[in-house]
């Protein structure tokens, strides 16, 4: 299988439902260190753990911006899914987090 995210210019981190990191692209490893096979909960406070639990239990997404080391970033966390074992549809399999550096000012377009 192709690793489409290996060299993209944003950090891509994926965990399973036990919050164990199952994938990091090159950018994620460079920013966060190699966390593959480790539980990510130790890196998060109680508030963040609550958000993680909600994403996993309700299948909702979470987005916000941060400033870190002089860069603004958009963080988007969204569930990923797998087919349900009983064939009834799909079930949350974990979380994908995208961390994208964004400029201080950027255009916004209304396409509606």
How should each PLM-predicted stretch be described?
Residues 1-24:
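Sensory modules in modular signal-transduction proteins
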Residues 23, 27-111:
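Sensory/regulatory domains in signal-transduction proteins
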């Amino acid at each position: 299988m192709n690793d489409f995210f290996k060299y993209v210019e944003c950090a891509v981190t994926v965990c399973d439902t036990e919050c164990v990191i199952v994938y990091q692209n090159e950018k994620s490893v460079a920013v966060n260190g190699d966390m593959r096979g480790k539980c990510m909960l130790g890196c998060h406070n109680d508030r963040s753990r609550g958000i993680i639990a909600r994403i996993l239990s309700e299948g909702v997404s979470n987005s916000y911006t941060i400033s870190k080391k002089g860069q603004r970033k958009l963080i988007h966390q969204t569930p990923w899914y797998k087919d349900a074992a009983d064939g009834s549809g799909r079930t949350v399999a974990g979380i994908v987090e995208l961390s994208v550096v964004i400029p201080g000012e950027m255009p916004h377009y209304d396409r509606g």
